[in-house]
Amino acid sequence: MNILVADDEEMIREGIAAFLTEEGYHVIMAKDGQEVLEKFQDLPIHLMVLDLMMPRKSGFEVLKEINQKHDIPVIVLSALGDETTQSQVFDLYADDHVTKPFSLVLLVKRIKALIRRYYVIEDIWRYQDVTVDFTSYKAHYKNEEIDLKPKELLVLKCLIQHKNQVLSREQILEEISKDVADLPCDRVVDVYIRTLRKKLALDCIVTVKNVGYKISL
């Protein structure tokens, strides 16, 4: 689980990162708005903690750009706790607003709550005539069991966890690497996707030219 922490104040940035690292999350840090956008090109980001007032690009500007390409939970940090600021934040589809100063313990609890809301997948996933059991790694299409490899189902699970978010082949492989050893070149993702589409008729898996794949749900 990759969490991006963006704040131009080093003490705040590193304090949040330390707490999250202790909880087992992988933390990426950014000190300004432009760096935030660059980080999104390097790694799949699952959740972002974003300060509003940053150099180069403000949190408002970052939110506008991120919303065009990614669907991830965002917690906004701000020294401004007035109704107008909070209204603007939620208008840009942020999930939560935390006013500085704040409790790190409570912030981490808010983060965990958002992760549960966004990313906890039921053991059984259903889409039209498809049923997938991610516990037993079995899939059925029109009540008939379909022969699929665990790697193919891991790719499907990865896309579901990032629903409506475009992932590159490299990002998909990185996501499933903790479960699969000795991964081949990234083009094997094309084979996995082709198999999922063919055997399960998953028209919800969309190819984004020159970028990668996403699942539209």
From Swiss-Prot:
Disruption phenotype: Expression of CbpA down-regulated at transcript and protein levels. Significantly increases nasopharyngeal colonization in mouse CD-1 strain intranasal infection model at 48 h and 96 h post-infection. Significantly increases numbers of bacteria found in the mouse lung at 96 h post-infection. InterPro entries: CheY-like_superfamily (IPR011006), OmpR/PhoB-type_DNA-bd (IPR001867), Sig_transdc_resp-reg_receiver (IPR001789), WalR-like (IPR039420), WH-like_DNA-bd_sf (IPR036388). One of its GO terms (molecular function) is phosphorelay response regulator activity. Keywords: Activator, DNA-binding, Phosphoprotein, Transcription, Transcription regulation, Two-component regulatory system. Residues 2-115 form the Response regulatory domain. Residues 122-217 bind DNA. The keyword DNA-binding applies. The modification 4-aspartylphosphate is found at D51. One of its GO terms (biological process) is regulation of DNA-templated transcription. GO terms for cellular component: cytosol; protein-DNA complex. Phosphorylated at threonine residues by StkP; threonine phosphorylation enhances RR06 binding to DNA and may also increase expression of CbpA. May be de-phosphorylated by PhpP. Member of the two-component regulatory system HK06/RR06 involved in regulation of target genes, including choline-binding protein CbpA. Binds to the promoter region of CbpA and directly activates transcription. Probably part of an rr06-hk06 operon. This is Response regulator RR06. It comes from Streptococcus pneumoniae serotype 2 (strain D39 / NCTC 7466).
